[in-house]
Structure formats: structure tokens, C-alpha cells
């Protein structure tokens, strides 16, 4: 994990071709890789000082690249062209042939994956297609420091059908930490962050984990879809176990237990239900908060059903064998399960 991560891959003076007039104008060109601050892109500045002054550059997002090529010398000397899938192009010239070749190789590697893991251009790489495919499912995030982890900084976040993984930004094969989706208590996002609260089931321990990212909405939708799929799977298991309990208890009234289907509350309703007792205390404390804290308090959350359904499955398993663990599960008119 990189705490001093720099997204600048290459930079230098070039002459960029204007899209409107077709005139080559000298500028300072910065090529940035994708990170928590934004996607892979070219930034054009008037000069090198403008970068230090954090001026507003003209940005070209480098996505959907068809090819990177060198223009023939008779057409334009020391020129490099980026061709996009919509047949548009960005062309620039360099001060020397060596500089043009360096730009060409760098753009080929970063935009097309022509070289992975220090494999030279032109040599076949049997692992490259799989690695590239896996990379497309990872999001650029910056993990903020938290008490439970001794790592933080720029990294890659991956969401599978069962887990959330963090991968090292420099070595994509090094896994840093993981969280089972069924251990998430809640999760949410805003314009610049994705946050989730994990329970005690995960190796990293319970706590709140916050990531700075420009892809918060996409991450949220992936997590939301995966947790819904887990919830549906557990619900099917739950219904099957209820059916088996009825068959086992059929005709044995002495050992039968009331086993009504568990009510599946919507996420929003369930979140309101468990926080209803805290509304009075939170309302008084909210008024005393500053503007930034109030914005954080309005952060969009979604409650994860998976842990609740897992607990319901455990309850039915206990009913099936006629054993209940005192202190963990209480059978009352309104069943309460803590996890």
C-alpha cells in the first residue's frame, strides 16, 4: 500500500495538435494513471510552473483507446498519436526521436497493457489477458487511517460475490486485507467517499472503514447487488429449513415449536427500526454539530440484510435440533438475535 503514491507516469514539453485549428502548440503534458483522484488522463498545461501552481489544465480522459501509434516521418516527425474507438485522435510531437519513443512505449504499456510485470514489448505474455481482465474489476481508492489496521493509503478495491478485497497498488498480486460481505453492518457513499461498517466476523475486526474515491457510486452498486444476492440465497436456505422443521415436527406436538416465516423488512425500514430509539439523542446532538459534521451525519447509508438472515438461519438450525443457546438468542413474542 502506498502512502506517498504519485499518479504521474510521464510528463514533459510537447507540441499538441489543436482539435479545432489543427495547429501544433507547445505545452507541458502530464500523463496520469488512474487513482483515487481520478481516471487515467492527459493534462495539458501552458508551462511546467502551472502544474506547481495547481492551475486548471485541459484534460483528455484516456479510455476506450484503440491503438497508440507513431506517425510516419514524412507525415510528421517525432510524432505520437492516440487513436480512440470513436476514431478521434490526440496527436503531439516531441523535441527528439528518443523522447517520442519513450512516450510511445509508456502510452502503449499503460493504455493497452502491451507490457505487464516488466515483460518486454514484443514477447508473448500468457498471463496478461487474465491479469488485465481482473484489473478491470478493481477500483482505485485511498484507505484512510483506522484503528484496526496498520496499513493505509492508495490501493485497489475489488468486490466479488462474497468478499471485499484490498490489493497493493504497486503489486496487483499482493492482497492486503479482506472483508466478507456477510459481515457488513452498513455501507454508504457520497461524492468523494465510500464507507462501510464491518462486524466481528471479519479478520480485520469490527469498525468503520472509509475510502476516498471518485468511483463511490460504482462501488456502492457492486456491494449492494452482491449483498442482495447473498440475502436472497440465505432466504432460500431459510425457507428450506423452515420446511424441514415442519416435516420433522409433524405429528409430534410435544416437541413442536412455533416456526413462522421471518419477516423480511426493507433495508430502509429495518435501518429506521434499529435506530428509532436513538433519534431523540441524535436530534439534540445534531444541532450542536458544525457544518462538516452535519454533512457527515447526512451520509447515505444502507443496512446489510445478510448478517440478519445468517442469524435467522442459526436460529432455525437450533430449533431443528431442539437446542437453544442461552445468552445469545432469546425466544420472546418478538425474537431478538444479536450478532
Curated annotation (Swiss-Prot):
GO biological process: cell surface receptor protein tyrosine kinase signaling pathway
Domain PH: 7-112
Record PTM: Phosphorylated on tyrosine residues in response to insulin, IGF1 or RET stimulation.
GO annotations of cellular component type: cytoplasm
Pfam family, one: PH
Keyword entries, A-Z: Phosphoprotein
SMART domains: IRS, PH, PTBI
Record's subunit section: Interacts with RET and TEK/TIE2. Interaction with RET is mediated through the PTB domain and requires phosphorylation of RET.
Comment, domains: PTB domain mediates receptor interaction.
Family indicated by similarity: Belongs to the DOK family. Type B subfamily.
Protein name (Swiss-Prot/TrEMBL): Docking protein 4
Organism encoding this protein: Pongo abelii (Sumatran orangutan)
Amino acid at each position: 500500500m502506498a502512502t506517498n503514491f504519485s499518479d504521474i507516469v510521464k510528463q514533459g514539453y510537447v507540441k499538441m495538435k489543436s482539435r479545432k485549428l489543427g495547429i501544433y502548440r507547445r505545452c507541458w503534458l502530464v500523463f496520469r494513471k488512474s487513482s483515487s483522484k481520478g481516471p487515467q488522463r492527459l493534462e495539458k498545461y501552458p508551462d511546467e510552473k502551472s502544474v506547481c501552481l495547481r492551475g486548471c489544465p485541459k484534460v483528455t480522459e484516456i479510455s476506450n483507446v484503440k491503438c497508440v501509434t507513431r506517425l510516419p516521418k514524412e507525415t510528421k516527425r517525432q510524432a505520437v498519436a492516440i487513436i480512440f474507438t470513436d476514431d478521434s485522435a490526440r496527436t503531439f510531437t516531441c523535441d527528439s526521436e528518443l523522447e517520442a519513443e519513450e512516450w510511445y512505449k509508456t502510452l502503449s504499456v499503460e493504455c493497452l497493457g502491451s507490457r505487464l510485470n516488466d515483460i518486454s514489448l514484443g514477447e508473448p505474455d500468457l498471463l496478461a489477458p487474465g491479469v488485465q481482465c481482473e484489473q478491470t474489476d478493481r477500483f482505485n481508492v485511498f484507505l484512510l487511517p483506522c484503528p484496526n489496521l496498520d496499513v493505509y493509503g492508495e490501493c485497489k478495491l475489488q468486490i466479488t460475490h462474497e468478499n471485499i478485497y484490498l490489493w497493493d497498488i504497486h503489486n496487483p498480486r499482493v492482497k492486503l486485507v479482506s472483508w466478507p460481505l456477510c459481515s457488513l453492518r452498513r455501507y454508504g457513499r457520497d461524492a468523494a467517499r465510500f464507507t462501510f461498517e464491518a462486524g466481528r466476523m471479519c479478520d480485520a475486526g469490527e469498525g468503520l472503514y472509509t475510502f476516498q474515491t471518485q468511483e463511490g457510486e460504482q462501488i456502492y452498486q457492486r456491494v449492494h447487488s452482491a449483498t442482495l444476492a447473498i440475502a436472497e440465497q440465505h432466504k432460500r436456505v431459510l425457507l428450506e429449513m423452515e420446511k424441514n422443521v415442519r416435516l420433522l415436527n409433524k405429528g409430534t406436538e410435544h416437541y413442536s415449536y412455533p416456526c413462522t416465516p421471518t419477516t423480511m423488512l426493507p433495508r430502509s425500514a429495518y435501518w429506521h427500526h434499529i435506530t428509532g430509539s436513538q433519534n431523540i439523542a441524535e436530534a439534540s446532538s445534531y444541532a450542536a454539530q458544525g457544518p462538516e459534521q452535519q454533512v457527515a451525519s447526512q451520509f447515505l447509508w444502507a443496512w446489510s440484510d445478510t448478517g440478519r438472515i445468517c442469524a435467522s438461519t442459526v436460529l432455525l438450525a437450533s430449533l431443528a435440533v431442539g437446542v437453544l443457546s442461552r445468552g445469545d438468542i432469546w425466544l420472546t413474542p418478538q425474537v431478538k438475535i444479536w450478532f
